[in-house]
Amino acid sequence: MGKDFKSLVTRCIYVGKMNDNAKKLKIATEELKDLGNNVMKRVKLCEEQQQMKRLDKVQTWLRQADTVIKEAEEYFLMSSSSSSSGLISSSHKMEKKICKKLKEVQEIKSRGMFEVVAESTGGIGGGAGGGLTIKDSDEQTIGLEAVSGLVWRCLTMENTGIIGLYGVEGVGKTTVLTQVNNRLLQQKANGFDFVLWVFVSKNLNLQKIQDTIREKIGFLDRTWTSKSEEEKAAKIFEILSKRRFALFLDDVWEKVDLVKAGVPPPDAQNRSKIVFTTCSEEVCKEMSAQTKIKVEKLAWERAWDLFKKNVGEDTIKSHPDIAKVAQEVAARCDGLPLALVTIGRAMASKKTPQEWRDALYILSNSPPNFSGQIS
């Protein structure tokens, strides 16, 4: 009787420990599941929206997490069987297995707090902006190839870290920036870890710039929104200072304090680049651009070619009187690619001389405002 009672007490102790650890294992496993789902969401965001590739260590961790979760779930079933078996040895062995698996789950969970989950594909990354291919129109590139080529060469020069593109609105600065961004993403061996595109606009908002950069480098933190501007800057700096990046800033109206935003200054060591567009040459000076490139209006022949391409030869030749008026309409676009493309497309279906004369009259008396469109 005494021996049986002692055996019963021992069994109860082992079963109690086993059940306690089984509960802890279940809680830890659920937490690991949640963490794994969060990491996978971040990975998919980077892969699908920013054309990035998940880090090898993240892929390994996801695989390990999935395996240990399945094993833990099997242990839940085994612990139930062991509890009802009545065997001390069985309960004791199961309790030790569960305890070991609990430590394994906790260890894997502790390694899952990734700041960055993905990198550029083939050495180039980021999105879209940055890392994100920006929609471009082939028709708008006529006459801008030389400027795009110059910016591209600057990206390979060691003594040029900050490049400023300036010129009047509608002259094609954003088109050039888009071409360079997309070319950088398409060519896989240029050595940039992140290619980041940020639209700045007239109303400068430093935290908005920080939030855009944070999304494009794949850093997602639930506490991000509660962080101060300085804390966000420190986290961005921590990540970008270890990587080579190309940062494209479109539509800059005033000096952007990039250091305050957390962006490390480009230098010979990090070999990073910053390229921005602005209407003001003064902003180029304020941004400490080592290279300033003025984007000029198109010469007449280039302007006329671009206009004709968007109108279509069929329309221009549809009536003998249209060609001359069409040239006058194109001249009113003042060599601005945006105006030439927009008005050219609008006139593509106009095949009577009167429609063209009406358009010329409107342009002569109230030139269109292209503010807010591609500049």
UniProtKB/Swiss-Prot annotation:
Positions contributing to ATP binding: 167-174
Coiled-coil zones: none
Example of a GO MF term: ADP binding
InterPro entries assigned: Apaf_helical, NB-ARC, P-loop_NTPase, Plant_NBS-LRR
All copies of domain NB-ARC, residue ranges: 158-372
Domain of life: Eukaryota
Swiss-Prot/TrEMBL keywords: ATP-binding, Nucleotide-binding, Plant defense
GO terms (BP aspect): defense response
Record's function text: Possible disease resistance protein.
Protein name, UniProt field: Probable disease resistance protein At1g52660
